[in-house]
A protein has these predicted regions:
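Short glycine-enriched loop/turn motifs at secondary-structure junctions
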Residues: 27-30, 67-69
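A short, exposed loop/beta-hairpin motif centered on an aromatic-Gly-Thr core
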Residues: 30-41
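N-terminal segment of the canonical double-stranded RNA-binding domain
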Residues: 1-21, 25, 49, 56
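Short, basic amphipathic alpha-helical segments that act as recognition/interaction helices
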Residues: 96-109
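Short Lys/Arg-rich basic patches
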Residues: 60-76, 80, 90-94, 98
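A short, charged, amphipathic alpha-helix used as a generic interaction element across diverse proteins
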Residues: 39-53
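Generic structural detector for well-ordered beta-strands
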Residues: 12-14, 36, 74-76
């Protein structure tokens, strides 16, 4: 995945063949914000401008710009995997939640 960072925000970068430009989509926002550029410098400038506009609109409307997360989500897995993970957690003296949290954290390393 191609990512670009500006001021603590990240954007996923892709190529748009219809416009013959690169497209960025800012991640983790409470709303949508994208931008286009023909080269990396232009893309970064447009990223900054798009982010500034988005943040200004959020300030004006009293909206939190970043998505808020509760720390909880549902995960659907096959029953066999659920059983294997439960047994592994028990063998390690951990809760299933702790085992899953470690595995997810390790996937980001």
């Amino acid at each position: 995945m191609n990512l670009m960072s500006v001021d603590g925000y990240q954007a996923r970068i892709s190529y748009d063949p219809e416009t013959d430009q690169f497209r960025g989509e800012i991640l983790g926002l409470s709303g949508g914000a994208d931008f286009y550029g023909s080269n990396p410098d232009e893309l970064r400038r447009e990223f900054k401008q798009s982010l500034e506009v988005f943040l200004e609109v959020c300030r004006e409307q009293g909206i939190e710009p970043r998505k808020q997360f509760s720390g909880k989500f549902n995960l659907r897995i096959p029953p066999e995997l659920h059983e294997q993970l439960s047994l592994e957690a028990e063998a390690q003296g951990k809760s299933l939640n702790a085992l899953a949290q470690e595995a997810l954290q390790n996937s980001l390393s």
